[in-house]
Amino acid sequence: MNYFLKAPILGFEHINEVRLEKIDSLFSRLISQTNSPMALDMVLVNPYCLREYSFVIPKYIELLLELDSHSKVEVYCVVVLQKNLEDSMVNFLAPLVFNSKNGFGAQVALSMMDYPDFGFRDPLKSFVIQERERA
């Protein structure tokens, strides 16, 4: 599905339209749809499949995305891929929030002070190992 970014992705402020493609229940891909010499193509992960994950969406983001009780909200975190997938890093401090009801999206920058259990370079393997131990 295509989304219009109402608040930019950090480092990609020139991109305002993206396509979100699901790879599987855990991973998705975000691809820029804006004509630009600096294209965006990143892997995202569903944070709720990895860990306990909860944060407050700031009021200004709620307003920008026109969120209400009927909105279908999807949240993803950016994955920095490494050669070995389990060595990849997840940024839990800058989630991407999408309202699939109206096609709006935004990135939220969370404070480490408010969310000390979230990191911006958490290794994917630590969550994969935890999941294996639970099974």
UniProtKB/Swiss-Prot annotation:
Gene Ontology BP term (one): bacterial-type flagellum assembly
Cellular component per GO, a single term: cytoplasm
Pfam families: FliW
InterPro entries associated with the record: Flagellar_assembly_factor_FliW (IPR003775), Flagellar_assmbl_FliW_dom_sf (IPR024046)
Signal peptide span: none
Subcellular location per the Swiss-Prot or TrEMBL entry: Cytoplasm
The keyword Cytoplasm is assigned to this record: yes
Keywords for the protein's UniProt record, in alphabetical order: Bacterial flagellum biogenesis, Chaperone, Cytoplasm, Translation regulation
Its biological purpose: Acts as an anti-CsrA protein, binds CsrA and prevents it from repressing translation of its target genes, one of which is flagellin. Binds to flagellin and participates in the assembly of the flagellum.
Annotated family: Belongs to the FliW family.
Self-association and partners: Interacts with translational regulator CsrA and flagellin(s).
Protein name, UniProt field: Flagellar assembly factor FliW
Organism: Helicobacter pylori (strain G27)
